[in-house]
Amino acid sequence: MKTRTSRLFRLSALAAGLCLAQAALAADPGAAPSYQALPAGNLCPAAAYDSRYNTKYLGFFTHLVQAQDDWLFRTTYDLRTDFGTSAEGWRELRALRDELKRKGIELVVVYQPTRGLVNREKLSPAEKAGFDYELAKKNYLATIARFRQAGIWTPDFSPLFDEKEEHAYYFKGDHHWTPHGARRSAKIVAETLKQVPGFEEIPKKQFESKRVGLLSKLGTFHKAAAQLCGNSYATQYVDRFETEPVGASDSGDLFGDGGNPQIALVGTSNSGPAYNFAGFLEEFSGADILNNAVSGGGFDSSLLAYMTSEEFHKNPPKILIWEFATHYDMAQKSFYRQAMPLVDNGCSGRKTVLSRKVKLRQGRNEVLLNSAALPIRSGSYVADVTYSDPSVHELKNTIWYMNGRREQLKIEQSKAVDTGGRYVFQLRNDSDWADQQFLSLEIEAPEDMPQGLEVQASICQAAPAKASQSVAGR
């Protein structure tokens, strides 16, 4: 009974605070709300057990620990001390960088620092004592060095570590950086951009960023804590910004001179408009940025969608900025199997050895058959598949080989991106698959198949550079 009364008191205080916040916003929409609410209280004991994070959504927060002033941290991601990828992951990443370089594109990776590295002062004394900050810092910097050894331009964010700024880099209870964190990051990234070959030739203009009100955030960590423990948290308010060319408001030329930006940005929701990362990049670099970031698409969806687009192939950027967090797996083989052939636009404009258009029926559909026994060596060929309905975001297919071996491959696209229903991927090029001779391609119809769905599938030879790299990488 005592516990319940205490919780009701906290909720009442929170409700009163929110009412005061609403009144403040009504009086001045651009002002930060002023209210007083009691802290939400400590997390419940269940939050300490990984087994309680038993859904795909909750698994992202394994596991939450209480910090100061309603701050929450995740032990798995925020307090990690290991970074980077496997030896195979580094090889694949280097190969992708080389392919982009061959196309005249310099790759810049924005490898976000963790909350533990930047905001460890917010940890409770016990959690701070248990977090090996020096090891995390050492390994993060070693990973930055590995990116650079792979020929990838990679900013060093260590000047932001252990910050004691008035405006925090991260939100109290959310995995995103605040606009202030985005601004500090963009300033460092812009200094790296200025070192990239070809940057000097990119047209420049002056940009300015202005505060345009407030951004409210009821954080993802706080929402997860509410599911696990029933805790309630106050909404956090921070400054919101927008960036535009100097004089654009007066001239009406809000989008510049109409030229194509020569720097493209792909990445996560951290690069979305709410945090103005792209705008701050424009301000500090003086260059137009084409922002292709996707919210909810992981580290790869926006890059794959951009590489599938007509824009990428007709107007390739001189510099490609790829932003993602440290917890993403850079060794995902399925990602590189798609990204590598997309550099040259799959089978578009290339001679195909097999091609067919089929109206799908329920179940499995044989779409391509190597009936002439053509010498289609798996390690040297690419498949290019396009659904007639772009709303289909999953490809389930089986690739059969002459000796009876088969590969069942499932590729899922984020519903946050539009790739026109197109899927491009390399056939298997592992050492024990590369010499297999292709026999057929079967596609399983989507469960909720649109009426009259058709698929166009082609097989073509990979670019010589790709074929040689796949062999060299083994």
Swiss-Prot record:
Pathway: Glycan biosynthesis; alginate biosynthesis. Disulfide bonds join 44-229, 347-460. One of its GO terms (cellular component) is periplasmic space. Residues 1-26 form the signal peptide. It comes from the Bacteria. It is found in: Periplasm. Pfam families: ALGX (PF16822), CBM_26 (PF16824). One of its GO terms (biological process) is single-species biofilm formation. It is an enzyme of class 2 (transferase). Disruption phenotype: Cells lacking this gene in the mucoid strain FRD1 are phenotypically non-mucoid, i.e. non-alginate producing, and secrete dialyzable oligouronic acids of various lengths that are mainly mannuronic acid dimers resulting from alginate lyase (AlgL) degradation of polymannuronic acid. Disruption of algX in the non-mucoid strain PAO1 does not visibly alter the phenotype of the parent. Residues 27-347 are annotated as: SGNH hydrolase-like domain. The active site is at residues 174, 176, 269. Belongs to the AlgX family. Consists of two domains, with an N-terminal domain with structural homology to members of the SGNH (GDSL) hydrolase superfamily and a C-terminal carbohydrate-binding module (CBM) that may bind alginate. Monomer. Interacts with AlgK and MucD. This is Alginate biosynthesis protein AlgX. It comes from Pseudomonas aeruginosa (strain ATCC 15692 / DSM 22644 / CIP 104116 / JCM 14847 / LMG 12228 / 1C / PRS 101 / PAO1). The gene is algX.
